Design a protein with these regions (language model features):
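Flavin-dependent oxidoreductase catalytic cores
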Residues: 1-74, 78, 82-89, 162-163, ...
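A short, gly/pro- and small-residue-rich
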Residues: 4-10, 167-182
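A short helix-to-beta-strand connector/capping loop
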Residues: 44, 130-137, 170-173
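Rossmann-like dinucleotide/flavin-binding elements
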Residues: 68-97, 138-146, 150, 158-167, ...
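Residues in the short beta-alpha loop(s) of Rossmann-like NAD(P)-binding domains
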Residues: 100
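N-terminal Rossmann-like dinucleotide/flavin-binding domain of flavoprotein oxidoreductases
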Residues: 105-149
Length: 205
């Protein structure tokens, strides 16, 4: 498909690589430890973090439905947009309900830093796909009662909520990671970062 899209001058339709190196590199433990086998010996184990069909097209083949439905997707992040994309390709009529004024969800914060250009490329690709596929997107539309959808199927794609440390004195002054990364809440000169995972390390950096 990559070559076909280039030949058809449809380069913008190619899903961008985010350089995660998690699936496509020769990193599988096929013979005990990473990188001790020839690439040709592990090609069948290649995967892609942003394209489930990579080397698994039979498993993830998108089959057309015989009974198209209107499906309401609550949340317009990456998960919601991918759900809408696949549903549309299957022949359904997905409708995205996003309570904010833009698509992207937590991925907007995840791609905010200057060195996260590849993530921003992926986010832009999803937005283009929503437009090109003609998927209905309702921004500033917070869903409060799914009964309004009647019997239509509903997909919840709202993501996770941050854990508030209410037992810690002064928690009301805390800034949530996404708030900082999006620049919506400032911090002082001396900052205590609670959590040393990838997000905490990125914020400390």
């Amino acid at each position: 498909q990559w070559i076909t899209k280039l030949m058809a001058d449809e380069g913008d339709d190619i899903r961008p690589c985010i350089l995660c190196h998690n699936g496509c590199f020769n990193m599988c433990h096929y013979k005990g430890v990473p990188n001790d086998q020839a690439l040709s010996d592990s090609l069948h184990l290649a995967r892609c973090a942003v394209n489930a069909e990579t080397m698994q097209w039979n498993k993830h083949y998108i089959k057309k439905t015989n009974s198209p439905k209107t499906v309401h997707i609550i949340g317009g992040g990456i998960g919601g947009m991918e759900t809408a994309r696949v549903l549309k390709l299957r022949g359904h009529n997905p409708i995205i309900h996003e309570k904010s004024g833009e698509l992207g969800g937590a991925f907007i914060a995840a791609s905010a830093e200057s060195y996260k250009g590849k993530l921003r490329d992926l986010l832009a690709w999803y937005k283009r796909r929503m437009e090109k596929l003609g998927i209905e997107v309702r921004l500033n539309d917070e869903v409060k009662d799914i009964a309004a959808f009647g019997g239509d199927p509903v997909v919840i794609a709202t993501g996770a909520a941050p854990r508030l440390l209410r037992h810690v004195p002064g928690y009301e002054k805390m800034v949530e990671a996404c708030e900082y990364l999006r620049g919506t809440k400032p911090v002082g000169e001396r900052v205590a970062v609670i959590g040393g995972g990838l997000t905490g390390s990125e914020i400390a950096y």
